[in-house]
């Protein structure tokens, strides 16, 4: 087997930089070093709090680069923790169903979070929101902010090896 040699998506190394800039520019070594500092087993314990299945995220440094299995709904739920001030709130796919006369057949009220749903402190959610806004302000998702002409987009881009797949997970307040 070959040794693991992580590289940045653009193949460049830009030297030391602050966490905020490294995350915005998708510099893989920044994320790897953060995970290395806290330890992959500790991170694996935490992923379930965000709605992910811990057993699908082996406790290795590759976790920092997204090696694991999540569904799009789990990803939306996980990022929702930051958008909801630190609470894990189940995503609402259908708000309301009405008939042709406008009568409500089914209504899905907004779930009001309580402390049992808290995943992280509100201050940490704020810090993460700030970091993820930088991705859309000056980082790898800056084009989306410019195209949509919105400055209230938060999220993170990602690519697989050889850029075969690319994604964006995030939100905007509504």
Segments and roles (model prediction):
Residues 2-52, 57-84, 123, 131-134:
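Active-site-adjacent helix/loop patches that line small-molecule binding or acyl-intermediate pockets
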Residues 24-25, 69-174:
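A penicillin-recognizing enzyme superfamily signal
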